[in-house]
Amino acid sequence: SHPSTVSQWAGVEALKHCGDNTSMMAAAYRERMEAAVAFLREELPQISFIEPKGAFYLFLDISSLKDCFGEREQPYSTAFTMKLLNEKHVAVAPGAAFGMDGFIRIAYAADKDTLLRGLGRIRDLVKELRREW
């Protein structure tokens, strides 16, 4: 499958005429990525992650929390994301959707303050799970 002809031409025009906006957005994503990485290193040093090299998301390794979910029919990354959504109101993607059940995918497309609030809630859930376990 491929984008429609109209979408392809719109993409060409965007690439020709949106250089300043592209640079501005790239800088904003870099700032958010750096803020997320700094937060994770400071607030969740016991949880590793795959540092992004150009995407607008990162993968957080939750494999150490696997036993917190016991027997289940769904992948534990899905169980974690559902718990995070239901209890902390933060939406992330389960790594199982990308063939990486030991991870969750965190997008940093939201503004920096929203991103850091969400990461704080992830930190809180991780700490709660470790206390319960």
Question: What are the residue ranges of the model-derived segments?
Answer:
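PLP-dependent class I/II
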Residues: 1-133
